[in-house]
Amino acid sequence: MAKKDGAIEVEGRVIEPLPNAMFRIELENGHKVLAHISGKMRQHYIRILPEDRVVVELSPYDLSRGRIVYRYK
């Protein structure tokens, strides 16, 4: 997992899949964010299903959107 400078990593749970490889994620603190899959996860065909636990990278500039960087087994 490559960590970007200034990015905030949080754990969450996938609530629902949306079109265009987007997902609604509920974070541990109860907030809901919109997230897309990172490029490496797309390259390796890692599937993300509802109820999966994931790590989301949030930008400090927009905390309502993020990137899924890891899916727990």
From Swiss-Prot:
The keyword RNA-binding applies. Residues 1-73 form the S1-like domain. One of its GO terms (cellular component) is cytosol. InterPro entries: NA-bd_OB-fold, RNA-binding_domain_S1_IF1, TIF_IF1. It comes from the Bacteria. One of its GO terms (molecular function) is translation initiation factor activity. Gene3D superfamilies: Nucleic acid-binding proteins. Its main location: cytoplasm. It holds the Pfam family eIF-1a. It is found in: Cytoplasm. Keywords: Cytoplasm, Initiation factor, Protein biosynthesis, RNA-binding, rRNA-binding. NCBIfam families: infA (TIGR00008). Component of the 30S ribosomal translation pre-initiation complex which assembles on the 30S ribosome in the order IF-2 and IF-3, IF-1 and N-formylmethionyl-tRNA(fMet); mRNA recruitment can occur at any time during PIC assembly. One of the essential components for the initiation of protein synthesis. Stabilizes the binding of IF-2 and IF-3 on the 30S subunit to which N-formylmethionyl-tRNA(fMet) subsequently binds. Helps modulate mRNA selection, yielding the 30S pre-initiation complex (PIC). Upon addition of the 50S ribosomal subunit IF-1, IF-2 and IF-3 are released leaving the mature 70S translation initiation complex. PANTHER family: TRANSLATION INITIATION FACTOR IF-1, CHLOROPLASTIC. Belongs to the IF-1 family. This is Translation initiation factor IF-1. It comes from Mycolicibacterium smegmatis (strain ATCC 700084 / mc(2)155) (Mycobacterium smegmatis).
